[in-house]
């Protein structure tokens, strides 16, 4: 594999591995928990943290039931939309997270799930 460049880090051949800490939605929609997870990733030596960016109502139907594994872990008293809404971070939250990452000198990445969050 040839060399790859992510920000100022060049990977491949004799260079070190670029480590991405996948936070995803494990912050449970809590910005303070997200910041603590960034701290943990930084302390563990990660080069980047990766989140998931989405608008729940653009991701699933309001009639969609939760998948079996979701029901097993979080119960059946809400729809998939209601569950995902709790995991959503606002655009303002993303900016706070991005700025926090810059201060910590750790790269911010996010996987967008819709066009609106990809543009932001």
How would you describe each model-predicted region?
Residues 74-120:
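Active-site beta->alpha loop and helix N-cap motifs at the rims of alpha/beta catalytic domains
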Residues 19-23, 49-51, 108-111:
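Hydrophobic faces of well-ordered beta-strands that scaffold small-molecule active sites
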Residues 14-17, 44-46, 104:
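Short coil/turn connectors at secondary-structure junctions
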Residues 30-41, 113-118:
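Short, acidic/polar
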Residues 1-20, 94:
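N-terminal amphipathic alpha-helix/helix-capping segment at the start of soluble metabolic enzymes
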Residues 9-12, 28, 41, 55-60:
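Active-site acidic carboxylates
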Residues 47-86:
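Glycine-rich, proline-tolerant flexible connector loops at the mouths of alpha/beta enzymes
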Residues 24-26, 54-56, 113-115:
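Active-site beta-loop-alpha junctions enriched in small/polar residues
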């Amino acid at each position: 594999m040839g060399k790859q460049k992510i920000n100022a880090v060049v990977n491949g051949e004799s260079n070190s591995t670029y480590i991405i800490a996948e936070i995803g939605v494990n912050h449970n929609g809590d910005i303070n928990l997200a910041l603590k997870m960034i701290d943990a990733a930084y302390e563990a030596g990660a080069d980047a943290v990766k989140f998931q960016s989405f608008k729940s109502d653009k991701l699933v139907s309001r009639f969609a039931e939760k998948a079996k594994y979701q029901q097993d872990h979080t119960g059946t008293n809400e729809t998939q939309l209601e569950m995902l809404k709790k995991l959503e971070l606002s655009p303002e939250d993303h900016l706070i997270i991005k700025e926090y990452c810059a201060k910590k000198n750790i790269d911010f990445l996010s996987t967008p799930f819709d066009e609106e969050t990809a543009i932001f």
